[in-house]
Amino acid sequence: MASFGWKRKIGEKVSKEVSQHFEEEAADESVVLDSHDVDWLHAIKRKKDVLLEDNVAKSKRLKEEGGLLAEDGRQKEALTKWDEAIQLTPGDAALYEMKAQVLMGVHEIFPAVQAAETAVQRNPHFVEAWQTLGRAQLSLGEITMAIRSFQIGLHICPANTELWEQDLNWARQLLLQKMDTESAERKRRDVNITREQIPDYDFESDEVVAACDAISQKQKMAAANKTVVVSASGSENLSDRKEDKVETNDSKEFIKAR
């Protein structure tokens, strides 16, 4: 704070001693004011620290109460407790991760994904948050995204056998099943398209009836020009009526016998 100094007005005569006296008093007052300002700022800072400590302690208490309520099956009340705790400590990733688990338990999948995403944003190295996010994404049907979340969690903590054996392997099996189902569906659609391309003929139309009649007449004429010849041995031979002679093996044998 700037020190107050006596300023001589124009036309006035002030002795040097009086002027120095006022300046000394002003300097003393400025020192007192500065010390009061320091005490006031320190008090404000201490008050903020106390409030912050109170918020952290209260948030921890609400978190624990919410956990007990969730274990007792009172999910809605647990969510209320955790929402209050989030208002006090919005940077606590564990609160969002616990909230995501309970939201999945009450089948609110999309809010669960949002809560888990917030958890990994607050703490990107939180393995359980990535695991919960992957499970929520699986429940939403986003298998590829879930596999990515599980892989990130394993990259952070490769020793997490549960994440590897249960979550990631299960997600990969679901992905293979989805691919097989999609492949079968594509084949079925291709068969339907092929069937649609085959024209549906009207077999009772005049053109088809006329063609069938012509084929029938041609077959009758061909049959009429054939003659059945029965040999002595009982075998039958077909020959055209236009031929004058019919020679068989049996007749040759008959002539030789005579």
Swiss-Prot record:
Give the domain of life. Answer: Eukaryota
Say if the entry is tagged with keyword ATP-binding: no
What keyword terms does UniProt attach to this protein?
Answer: Repeat, TPR repeat
TPR repeats by residue range: 59-92, 93-126, 127-160
Comp. bias (Basic and acidic residues): 238-258
Where do the TM regions start and end? none
Q: Which PROSITE patterns match?
A: TPR, TPR_REGION
Q: Where is this region: Disordered?
A: 231-258
Q: Which SUPFAM superfamilies match?
A: TPR-like
Q: Has the keyword Repeat been applied to this entry?
A: yes
What InterPro entries does the annotation carry? TPR-containing, TPR-like_helical_dom_sf, TPR_rpt
> What protein is this chain from?
Tetratricopeptide repeat protein 33
* Organism this protein belongs to: Xenopus laevis (African clawed frog)
